[in-house]
Structures are given as C-alpha cells and as structure tokens.
Amino acid sequence: MIKWAIIFFIISLVAGLFGFTNISAGAAGIAKVLFFIALAIFLIVLIFGVGLGMLVF
C-alpha cells in the first residue's frame, strides 16, 4: 500500500509540474489516504504482535 501511495505522490508531482493542478490535488489526496490507511494497519499489526508476544513469553 505504501508503494501505491508513493506512485500517486509521484503522479501528483508530475501533474503539478505540467500545470494540471486538479489532477495533482486529486492524486495527492489519494496518496494521503493510502498512507494513513497503511499507517493504521501497521499500528494495528504492531499492537497485536506485541500483545500476542506477551502471551507467548
């Protein structure tokens, strides 16, 4: 998911460079959403991993 966020970030930069501001804003918004979803999934997995690790040891 981080890969897609980076791809949309690059699309946003290229579109902004060529003056397509609406496309740039849309791609940047998608990149932000994907980044925060990936961050939330990482934190959930981290919490479960620590919790289950405590149960095992």
Curated annotation (Swiss-Prot):
Pfam families: DUF1328. It is found in: Cell membrane. Keywords: Cell membrane, Membrane, Transmembrane, Transmembrane helix. This is UPF0391 membrane protein azo1765. Its main location: membrane. One of its GO terms (cellular component) is plasma membrane. The keyword Hydrolase does not apply. The chain crosses the membrane at residues 1-21, 33-53. It is a multi-pass membrane protein. Belongs to the UPF0391 family.
